[in-house]
């Protein structure tokens, strides 16, 4: 088990909250934080199937949920900034920023479900990594469910031949 100094992690998450409205600065700070906790000496089993084929940091499994918890209230309080930040994080070549983008979108208020739906459709129209797809469908769907648009969103995806 990896020891994580929760006091230091909370300070690092506070730095992320301070630059939440500046997506490029946030992305750099996030990469610095993830790089700080990366386990360089850990090697997964050779035959283990990776969760994602994107580049990824080898992080302790409790780190990303702690970051998500630390940013939850900020995401809920600043929905416009959350959308802008998620769009920037989704362009990142690493898996963890994309997973964080999906989580942040899931914290949007229900009145942003139309914007979320359009954003998800745009992202799903592109080739997508299975791990990132799983993160999208598990972490970002809450606003659609709250607005009772989840079923219609899925039916639209299934019936639209252009998105296949």
Language model regions located:
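Alpha-helical scaffold domains
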Residues: 1-164
């Amino acid at each position: 088990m990896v020891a994580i100094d929760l006091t230091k992690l909370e300070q690092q998450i506070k730095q992320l909250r301070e630059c939440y409205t500046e997506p490029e600065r946030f992305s750099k700070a996030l990469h610095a934080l993830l790089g700080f906790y990366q386990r360089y000496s850990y090697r997964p089993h050779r035959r283990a199937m990776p969760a994602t084929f994107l580049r990824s940091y080898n992080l302790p499994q409790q780190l990303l949920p702690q970051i998500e918890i630390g940013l939850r209230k900020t995401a809920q309080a600043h929905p416009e900034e959350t959308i802008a930040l998620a769009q920037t994080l989704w362009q990142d070549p690493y898996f963890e920023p994309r997973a964080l983008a999906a989580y942040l979108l899931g914290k949007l208020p229900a009145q942003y479900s139309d914007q979320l739906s359009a954003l998800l459709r745009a992202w799903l129209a592109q080739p997508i990594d299975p791990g990132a797809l799983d993160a999208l469908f598990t972490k970002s769907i809450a606003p659609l469910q709250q607005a009772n648009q989840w079923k219609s969103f899925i039916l639209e995806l299934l019936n639209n031949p252009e998105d296949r």
